[in-house]
Amino acid sequence: MKLTFPRWTIIALVGFALATPAFAHHSFAIFAMDKNVTYKGKVVEYRWLNPHSHIIMKVDAGPDVDPQTVGTWDMEGGSTNIMGRQGWNRVTYKAGDAITAVAHPLKDGSKGASLFYVLLPDGKRLYHDIARPKGDTSE
C-alpha cells in the first residue's frame, strides 16, 4: 500500500496527538524541581501501587521542623518496578513510622511533592526513582 505524502503526514500528526497525554502525564512541570525541601514526620499511609507509589505523611510542628512543612503531605514516588530496583518494597513503611523525606514541592503551594529520597535511620538514602545523582553511593 502506497501512502501519499499528505495522507502520511495526517497519520503522523494524529499519532503525535494521541501520544501527547502520555508525555503530559510524565511531566514534572507541576513540581518545583529546583527546590529540595526536607519533611520530617510520620507515615499516615504507604501506597505501593502503579503507576505511582505514594507516602502520605504528617509533619507536626517542632523545634527542628520548618513551619512551611507542617501538615499532611502526599509524596509521589515512581512505579513499583522502578522503586523496587532502588530497594523499596510493599512493606518498606507502615503507618506510624518516623520518616525524613526530601522532595520537590508542588509549585502551587498545595500539600504535595515529588519524592526525591528518604533518609534512613542509618543515614543512607533510599531514592524513589532513577534520580540518584552520579557519585552518590548510598544504598
Q: Can you name each region flagged by the protein language model?
A:
Residues 49-62:
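Short aromatic-glycine-enriched beta-strand elements
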Residues 41-43, 98:
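Conserved hydrophobic positions within beta-strands
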Residues 76-85:
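Short, structured beta-strand/loop micro-motifs enriched in basic residues and often containing a Trp
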Residues 1-12:
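Bacterial N-terminal signal peptides that target proteins for export
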Residues 106-130:
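OB-fold/S1-family single-stranded nucleic acid-binding modules
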Residues 85-100:
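Short nucleic-acid-contacting surface segments enriched for D/E, G, S/T with interspersed K/R
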Residues 23-37:
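Short boundary/loop segments of OB/S1/cold-shock single-stranded nucleic-acid-binding domains
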